Amino acid sequence: MFLRVTTFLTALLLALPLAARAAEPLVVSVWGGNWKDTIERVVAKPFTAKTGIPVEFEVGGTIDRLAKARVAKGNPLVDVTFTTSHVGRLYISDGLYERPDMTKIPNAKEIAREAIRSPYHLGSWAYVYIVVYRPDLVKEEITRWADLWKPSLRGKIAVPDFDPSHIITIAALMEGGNESTWQKGEDRLRQLKPNIVAFYSTDAQSQDLMKTGQAPVEVMLSVNAYHLQEQGVAVKLVQPTDYPGIVGIDTMGIMAGSKRADAAYQFIDLVLSREIQSQLVESLKVGPVNGGATVPAKLRGQPGIFLTPAEWKERGYIIDDEVRAKMLPAWREWFTANIVKK
């Protein structure tokens, strides 16, 4: 009897570290607000229900979270990071991401080619920056990027100043260039300046400018435009007939040195599943990266929603991630000096 009790107690003590490890949370780094709330509700809760592993969040801005990751290199405070595709390149160049074993992410076989951003990070959803306007305040129809330069739109447009990649690339494309030869669009951008009434640096500012009518035309994130429509603001998203919308793909990566890599693989695989992708589309109004996701009829064919290879190719322009990551500081500096300043 004594031997049995001793053996049982020994086994129990040996099992404690394993149980403790099983209870350790998976830490996910993500933006705040609706992004975090949606990931928690749509992904984290089902993940915990399925695996028994709790999920905690690091919340912050894109660059702030990158800075924290750099400080914690080799002993990361988080396990999975959501960030933009081009900033993901900075994580990679700094050695902050683990190169994943794709056999551990079976749902990755179903995602669009465009969502495989590198051997280190995978797309989670897509959206576009396009022209959005209020037909009740702008009587003429806007159908092209080129319409932004019309004299009739003087003092009516808002654009982002924190990341001018979108309008810089469009201006370059209009002059026969691209993001790599962006200087070709400099003069055209200067010509746009009289039409710009405001700049924004947050989603909230962007939406407020449109709601109040201060800027009834914007280069806007499609997600924000759909949100305004849900609030009853009559905005129209333009499918430009001259150049596509500028695609954004948010991505996921596993932090190098994560002690919860196995759980991280399961989390990422769940995000890419058809069921979760369908819920993300419904909740965030983003485009799925898994073409098998269910998309509401009202969103099919709309800006930022790509379901086939042809739609990815024809209705979206993807800026080269490495060029964007490298050039963004220079673009921001030029844009501030030449467009933002009076």
Identify the meaning behind each predicted range:
Residues Y127, D187-L192, Q231-A256, G301:
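Periplasmic-binding protein-like
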Residues H86-L90, K211, P216-A234:
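A ligand-binding cleft/hinge motif common to bilobed small-molecule-binding domains
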Residues G33-E40, L77-Q214:
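Extracytoplasmic ligand-binding site segments that recognize negatively charged/polar headgroups
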